[in-house]
């Protein structure tokens, strides 16, 4: 594949001679706007999702399972939709699904939640593929225009976005903590006011999304107005779905993509219900998830700053996985619910450690896909959401039927396999990069030596 020829190119700093610095756009403005827009939208959706399994019981659990099944299947066609619409238009359209889902929570029933969940699956697929495509594109343009190292810019841009995005858990759950009250016999009050506040926040985020600039050349990218082009695009859809899975690099990182979804679903479906709620109540879910979001944000920004290439990504991901494993082992072997200060502190400490792991995974996976799949960004991020949403859906559907201990064993096994697979992938790609760089060096050295000779081929023949 053509993309394989460049898999390690961003990981090697170019010399000053090879870079042409030209005056260009400053794309940091668009990163700020995109990040704030996602913060406003997801502080509402994230907090609502955290409450689904505790407030809406089985309806909430099944609705989230339906949502992520829809998300998984729609992600298979999301790259085509984003290419046809353009990443900015896809981002704007994607916000509508989140608005509708929160609105459905004003009157939660099977007739409101199931359709809203199905549509949100589609909307989520295009907004996340659009986000990954847009952020990667402007990072590359910014690096090219300002003569910066591409891998570092991708890391910084992803670090800022994911740090701001992680703050949605902090702010959204602080709002939940302030407005939601525990009632008698496990009931809660204040949910209607909470959802109205969330809808207002989402509306602001949607409006703000209109102010990001389109990617250069994107206007002519999708053949929306051409019936022939549209038919050709639809005909190529099976190839677009299958082709990424024929790339050995994608197959090698599938366990990492799936684990990132598993660990998120564990927090949303199991941790909030089985650990936080019994210890500090339904209203305490907001406080625990606020701590989770705060550490998630800090680690997203920090990890993004240290990202420079495949080796750094592997090292950072391993650190995040070790942090999360400590919580899984604690819950499996040593945790017992207690009263008093420790009974409140333990879930908060666990939430903080899980947030560290999530912040690391988010930034590093996005940077990894951007570095390895330069020629098919939409397809790469679509695969990310396919495997993430599939893993999340499995957890939500199994949650009512599987014990916490069994889930923890699954998480530990998957974590260990993911870490080993990530190290193997890094080693394989690094060796491949060394062999290619050695070949390039030998070729360049041969050319330079030959050019330094006093006579050329033509002159040597004419001389003799």
Curated annotation (Swiss-Prot):
Keyword Transmembrane in annotation: yes
Domain of life: Eukaryota
Topology of this chain in the membrane: Multi-pass membrane protein
This protein's GO CC annotations: plasma membrane
InterPro entries registered for this protein in UniProt: Ion_channel_UNC-93, MFS_trans_sf, UN933_plant, UNC-93_regulatory
Similarity field: Belongs to the unc-93 family.
Protein name, per record: UNC93-like protein 3
């Amino acid at each position: 594949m053509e993309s394989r020829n460049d898999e390690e190119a961003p990981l090697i700093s170019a010399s000053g001679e090879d870079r042409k610095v030209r005056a260009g756009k400053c794309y940091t403005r668009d990163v700020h706007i995109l990040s704030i827009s996602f913060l406003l939208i997801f502080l509402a959706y994230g907090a609502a999702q955290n409450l689904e399994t505790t407030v809406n019981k089985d309806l909430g659990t099944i609705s989230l399972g339906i949502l992520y099944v829809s998300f998984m299947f729609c992600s298979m066609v999301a790259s085509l939709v984003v290419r046809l619409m353009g990443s900015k238009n896809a981002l704007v359209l994607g916000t509508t699904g989140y608005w509708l889902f929160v609105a459905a929570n004003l009157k939660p029933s099977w007739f409101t939640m199931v359709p809203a969940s199905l549509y949100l699956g589609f909307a989520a697929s295009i907004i996340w593929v659009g986000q990954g495509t847009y952020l990667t594109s402007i990072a590359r343009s910014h690096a090219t225009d300002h003569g910066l190292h591409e891998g570092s810019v991708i890391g910084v841009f992803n670090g800022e976005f994911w740090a701001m995005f992680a703050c949605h858990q902090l702010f959204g759950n602080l709002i939940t903590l302030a407005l939601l009250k525990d009632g008698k016999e496990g009931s809660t009050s204040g949910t209607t006011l909470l959802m109205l506040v969330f809808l207002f926040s989402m509306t602001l985020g949607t409006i703000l999304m209109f102010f990001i600039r389109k990617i250069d050349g994107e206007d002519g990218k999708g053949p929306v107005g051409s019936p022939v082009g549209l038919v050709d695009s639809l005909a190529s859809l099976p190839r677009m779905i299958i082709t990424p899975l024929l790339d050995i690099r994608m197959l090698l990182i599938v366990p990492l993509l799936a684990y990132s979804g598993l660990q998120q679903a564990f927090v949303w479906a199991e941790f909030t219900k089985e650990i936080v709620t019994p210890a500090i109540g339904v209203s305490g879910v907001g406080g625990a998830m606020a701590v989770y979001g705060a550490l998630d944000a800090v680690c997203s920004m920090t990890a993004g700053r240290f990202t420079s290439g495949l080796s750094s990504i592997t090292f950072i991901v391993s650190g995040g996985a070790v942090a999360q494993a400590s919580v899984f082992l604690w819950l499996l072997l040593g945790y017992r619910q207690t009263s008093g200060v420790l009974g409140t502190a333990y879930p908060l400490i666990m939430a903080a450690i899980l947030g560290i792991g999530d912040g690391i995974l988010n930034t590093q996976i996005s940077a990894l896909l951007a570095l390895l799949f330069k020629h098919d960004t939409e397809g790469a991020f679509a695969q990310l959401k396919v495997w993430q949403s599939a893993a999340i859906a499995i957890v939500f559907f199994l949650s009512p039927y599987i014990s916490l201990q069994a889930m923890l064993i699954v998480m530990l096994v998957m974590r260990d396999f993911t870490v080993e697979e990530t190290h193997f992938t890094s080693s394989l790609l690094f060796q491949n990069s060394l062999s290619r760089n050695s070949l390039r060096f030998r070729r360049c050295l041969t050319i330079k030596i030959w050019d330094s000779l006093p006579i050329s081929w033509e002159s040597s023949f004419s001389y003799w």
